[in-house]
Structures are given as C-alpha cells and as structure tokens.
C-alpha cells in the first residue's frame, strides 16, 4: 500500500511539473527576471534564479502584512514544512521539513546554529520566538549537511534579524484579545554607511486554556471535572550593531534573549490535567568580521559565537485512586551550551566561478539535574554532564557555464570528538532563462545527523558506539514568472532515503546495565512528494493570491507504515484585498489531511479546515488599527493526540511607526 501511494505521488507530481514546464515554454518573450537574493543556499549572497536549491523566502514585510502573531504562523506558509504545537501558545512547537524529524532541521539565527544540545533529539523549540525584528526567513529544503553539517538532513531555517538602515526609525505595537491575551512590541533602528543599529523587544501574556482535553469531546465525556487553564508568558530581546570603518572592512555584533514561561499537561494518564510548569530561556551572541583582500577578489569572514539554552520543569503528576491520589512532584533542569568559531573564504576565480571554503570548531555541553519534592523530598542530583567538540572543513565551487547554466558542487567533513567522522556532498544545477522568466533547477546530496549528547553519553540509556544518521536526497523543480511578473508559479519533486536512524529499544548491543533498552541505529525511512506554490497579483494594487501545497508520503521502512504526524496533503490559500486606500483584508484558509499522532499508524487525527483573517486600516500616516480573527470556522482539531487547540478567537490592536 505504501508503494502504491508513492507511485501515485510521483505520477501526480510529474504531471503537475510537466504542466509548469509547458507553461514556461509558452511564456517566451516576457522579459522577466528572478533576481531575489538569498544567502542560505550557498553560504553567501546569490540570486535565487542561479540557485539549484528549493528555497522559500518570507520577508518581514510579508509577516507584517499577514499579521502573524507567532513565528509558527509565519512558517506555516512554506511548502514542504509542517509544524505541530502541543496545545496552543507557549507549548512545544516542532518543525519537520519534507517529512524529516524535528531534530533533522537545522535552525540558524543570523547564520548561527541554535538547536538545543540538551534535548534528546537536538531539536529547536519554535515556541520561543516571535516575529519581531526579523528582516527575512529563508527556508532551504533538502539535505544541506555539505554546507552546514549535522542537523541539516531535512533542511535549514535561517532567521535573519533586521539591520538598521537610513534615518532613525521607531515602531510600537500593542494588542489584546481572546483567552486573556495581551502583547506589546517595540523596535528602533537606523544607520549610515559607517554605522547601523537595530533593537527590538516584545512581550506576550495569555491565560490560555487547558492543553489537555480542551474542546475534545471524547475526553470531556470521560473526565467531566473543570479543567485548569495553562497560560504562557514570553519575552524577547534582540539587538544588532554594525560598523564599517572602510569599504573593505565590516564588523557585525548581535545578540538575543528569549524567555518562555508556560504551564503544561500530560497527554495521557488517569490525571493528565496537572499544574506542571516550565521556564525555557535562550541566549545567544555573535561577532562577525568581514575583510576584503586582493582587490576584493577574496572575502574573509571570521565568526565567533556562543549560545545557551536552559529548561527548568516543575513536573507534577498524580497516581493512585481518584478518591485519594498521590502527588509526585520533581524539579528537573536541563542546560545546553554551545561555543564556536569559524572562518569562511569566498575567492573569485573570474571565469572559473566562485570558490567558498572554510572551517569551524564548535563545542557543545549538556547538563541535566533532578530533585524530588513529593512524596519524598530529596537532594538535587546531576544526571548528565557531557561535552563534545566538532571540527569541520567545507568547500563549495560555483560556476556559470555559458549564459544560462549555473552549477555547484560542495562537500564537508565533520570530525566529532569520541565519535565517527563523516563526510557529505551536494550538487546543484540551475538553468536560468531570463527572457521567459523561467528557472529549471535540480539538486542532489547527502545528509548526516550526529548522535546527540544525550543519545551517546547519558549514563542510563546512552550508547557511545552510535553512528550518525544518514540520508540521500534529490529534487527537481521549476520556477516560472508570467504576465510581466504578476504571476509566479513554482513546482518541486523530491525524494529522500534515510538510514541508520536512531531509536530507543531493547537490543543485544545494549550494555548489561541497560535492561530497559538503549539508543541504537536501527530504523530506515523514505519520504517523497511534491511542493507547489503560486503568487498572483490578480488586480494590481487591489487583490493578491498566495497558495502553497505539499503532497508528502513518509514511510517507516522497518514496518512499511506511515510516519507519525506527517499529513499526506497540506494546503494554504491566502488572499490580500485592498478595497480602499489604507485598508487591507487578508483571509487565509488552511487545509490539513488526516495523519497519525503516534508511530505504527496509531491515534489517527482527523483532517481539518481552518479560516483565519487579518485586517488593518491606516488611520493616519504611520498609525494603523488591526483586527485578527483565528479559527473563524471554530474547527475542533488536534495537532498532537489529546492536546486541544484554540477555538474561534479575536484580537485587536494598534501599530505606530515614525
């Protein structure tokens, strides 16, 4: 059955891709160019038309026009990206790219890796971030380990913060609405050719709703008692400063701090609705120096960085009889640290292209502690105290052949202290027909994810002999602009083979003191499908259309069953209407297919349709009122089994800039 689904996916994708190519053939004569610049696809500025990679760019202006309240809402518009939240605002938010695991998505802030070394799978929790002070988000899909190393098996999400430009500017926004929610944002920025600055901060507070069981009829029927609300408080601060003493030298210093204090529930059990709470903190700093040499033929980039993630849990659970339950209460803490330095050189070879090369040294640390409080108090004990250093070398050669063809070939070697050394490669092709606004592209490469510190070195469950997870991925696509740029179409076919995936289970390779099991390289998986996107200016200045669609078949090859939390079909349809000067109305319809919450095709989650709407009106220059409606269809759905989602919600606020 899995094989037939994959064949249907491939056939349908080829048909749709062929249709786009035929449309491109008929578009000759439209003098259009695709000259948007991206930096993630090649570790440096490159016109998107010359990139063979599948990359989506979300600008800060697009985020503002859509009225995205969280970074999660902004990311949901990306084809090939799936995001799940465990019960509303403040809950753990996990991103999967093309069916990969959350820990197989590399997350960068201004080019610096921020995945959490203290988690079991190394994933980044997107609930920490809000879309304030963001200049753009670049989402690069497919294996990218040849450029970025471990964690980039599924792709890369690069969050680029705003850089100050021009006259000093300031902005402020405030809002309030359903579930006792209120938030405020503020930003200042400015700059000249020598110095620039940008600072932003935000705060958000919500009373929320019970993460377990909220608006889930089958659970409320079995557990009719009142549910306690699980609120959340978030704070974020980011700052970036730049100084250029000359045309050939530039310095960039930045940092950010985020705090997410939230309450949470268990997903299962006799008493899942508990007063448990957590506080998560992320702090990161970086300093970058760029020096041009040899008549600007060589650009040298030096980077040092550090980040630290702290997670503190007040875990409360109940067991025993309903008449006299026993309280189990513990305080658990996790700290993940990272410090590193890198060098990158970009050497112009004139007609022979551009050579990018460099190296990196990075040290990661993990500390975890636990202290029992009830029913028997105890002392705080250290469970994990581990560290590892990774040394890497990478190179990428890009060359333009003739007028239209652009090729790249790159590779990387990562050497992890006490673990396996691994090599990865990647090749891309882009055929840019500027006369017709057409780009044909393809890429192939390998990915790898090193075992996390917890998987390798945890005293109870770790396995120091683990090997990296591996993948091979290919994709092919077309980007086409029509009607003088008013319509942009994009289609991509993709296929990934994953092996040596790490699972926890009983295995002969486990140590004698691991009777319950350990982590082992045992699993295999395949993901395939196609991504479609369309942007259209239906009525210039009045009506715009934005569509993203993903078809995904993700199969666990050890069981030939579908992987959990991967819907086969996902679509997002957005309109932007400007019926009068200063008035913008943007409805969005999200359609998500059925999927399974747990492995082995267990806990089926029903499909759903959700309608959101954002409207803003500029009452005077620089001052706007806005209204946002979420889930106006009042759809009852779950992204994770037994965790509720918000019902029909309304929010209103004010924005001002000067």
Segments (PLM) and residue ranges:
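Extracytoplasmic beta-strand/coil segments of soluble accessory domains associated
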Residues: 72, 76-116, 135
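N-terminal periplasmic accessory domains that precede
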Residues: 71-74, 93-96, 105-108, 124-130, ...
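Outer-membrane beta-barrel signature, preferentially recognizing the C-terminal barrel domain
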Residues: 270-293, 334-337, 386-388, 432, ...
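Flexible loop and strand-edge segments within Gram-negative outer membrane beta-barrel domains
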Residues: 206, 210, 228-234, 248-300, ...
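Short acidic/polar hinge/loop motifs at secondary-structure boundaries
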Residues: 113-141, 460
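Periplasmic-side early beta-strands and strand-to-turn transitions of outer-membrane beta-barrels
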Residues: 158, 165-167, 173-175, 187-278
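Gram-negative outer-membrane beta-barrel transporters
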Residues: 400-407, 494-497, 518-599, 633
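Conserved C-terminal beta-signal and adjacent last beta-strands/turns
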Residues: 189, 200, 244, 536, ...
């Amino acid at each position: 059955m899995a094989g037939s689904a994959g064949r249907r996916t491939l056939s349908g994708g080829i048909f749709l891709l062929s249709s786009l190519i035929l449309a491109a053939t008929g578009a000759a004569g439209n003098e259009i160019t695709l000259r948007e610049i991206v930096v993630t696809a090649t570790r440096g500025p490159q016109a998107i038309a010359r990139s063979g990679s599948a990359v989506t760019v979300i600008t800060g202006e697009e985020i503002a026009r859509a009225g995205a309240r969280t970074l999660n809402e902004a990311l949901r518009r990306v084809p090939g990206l799936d995001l799940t939240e465990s019960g509303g605002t403040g809950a753990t938010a996990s991103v999967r790219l093309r069916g990969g695991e959350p820990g197989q998505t590399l997350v960068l802030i201004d080019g610096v890796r921020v995945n959490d070394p203290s988690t079991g799978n190394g994933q980044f929790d997107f609930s920490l971030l809000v879309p304030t002070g963001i200049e753009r988000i670049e989402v690069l899909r497919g294996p990218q380990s040849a450029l970025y190393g471990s964690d980039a098996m599924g792709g890369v999400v690069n969050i680029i913060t705003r850089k100050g430009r021009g006259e000093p500017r300031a902005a402020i926004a405030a809002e309030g609405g359903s579930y006792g929610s209120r938030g405020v944002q503020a930003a200042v920025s400015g700059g000249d050719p020598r110095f620039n600055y940008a600072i932003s901060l935000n705060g958000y507070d919500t009373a929320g709703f019970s993460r377990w069981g909220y608006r889930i009829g089958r659970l409320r029927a079995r557990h009719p008692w009142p549910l306690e609300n699980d609120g959340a408080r978030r704070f974020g601060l980011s700052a970036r400063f730049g100084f250029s003493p000359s045309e050939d030298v530039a310095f960039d210093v930045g940092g950010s701090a985020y705090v997410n204090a939230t309450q949470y529930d268990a997903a299962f059990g006799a008493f899942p609705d508990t007063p448990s709470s957590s506080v998560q903190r992320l702090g990161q700093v970086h300093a970058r120096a760029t020096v041009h040499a040899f008549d600007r033929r060589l650009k040298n980039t030096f980077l040092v960085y550090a980040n630290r993630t702290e997670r503190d849990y007040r875990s409360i659970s109940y067991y025993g009889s309903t008449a006299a339950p026993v309280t189990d209460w513990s305080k658990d803490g996790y700290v993940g640290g990272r410090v590193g330095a890198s060098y990158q050189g970009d050497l112009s070879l004139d007609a022979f292209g551009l050579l990018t090369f460099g190296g990196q040294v990075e040290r990661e640390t993990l500390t975890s502690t636990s202290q029992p409080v009830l029913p028997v108090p105890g002392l705080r004990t250290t469970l994990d105290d581990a560290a590892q250093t990774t040394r890497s070398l990478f190179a990428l050669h890009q060359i333009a052949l003739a007028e239209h063809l652009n090729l790249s070939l790159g590779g990387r070697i990562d050497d992890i202290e006490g673990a396996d050394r691994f090599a990865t490669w990647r090749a891309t092709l882009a055929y840019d027909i500027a006369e017709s606004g057409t780009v044909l592209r393809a890429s192939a490469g390998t990915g790898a994810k090193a075992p996390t510190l917890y998987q390798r070195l945890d005293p109870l469950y770790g396995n120091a002999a683990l090997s990296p997870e591996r993948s091979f991925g290919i994709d092919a696509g077309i980007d086409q602009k029509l009607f003088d740029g008013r319509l942009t179409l994009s289609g991509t076919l993709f296929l990934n083979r994953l092996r040596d995936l790490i699972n926890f289970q009983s295995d002969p390779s486990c140590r004698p003191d691991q009777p319950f099991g350990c982590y082992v390289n045992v699993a295999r998986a395949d993901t395939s499908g196609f991504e479609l996107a369309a942007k259209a200016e239906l009525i210039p200045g009045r009506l715009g259309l934005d569509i993203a669609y993903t078809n995904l078949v993700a199969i666990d090859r050890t069981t030939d069953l579908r992987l959990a939390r991967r819907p086969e079909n996902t679509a997002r349809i957005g309109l932007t209407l400007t019926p009068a000067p200063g008035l913008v109305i943007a409805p969005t319809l999200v359609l998500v297919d059925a999927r399974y919450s747990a492995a082995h095709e267990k806990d089926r989650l029903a499909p759903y349709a959700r309608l959101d709407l954002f409207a803003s009106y500029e009452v005077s220059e620089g001052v706007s009122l806005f209204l946002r409606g979420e889930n106006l269809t009042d759809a009852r759905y779950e992204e994770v089994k037994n965790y509720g989602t918000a019902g029909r919600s309304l929010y209103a606020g004010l924005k001002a800039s000067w």
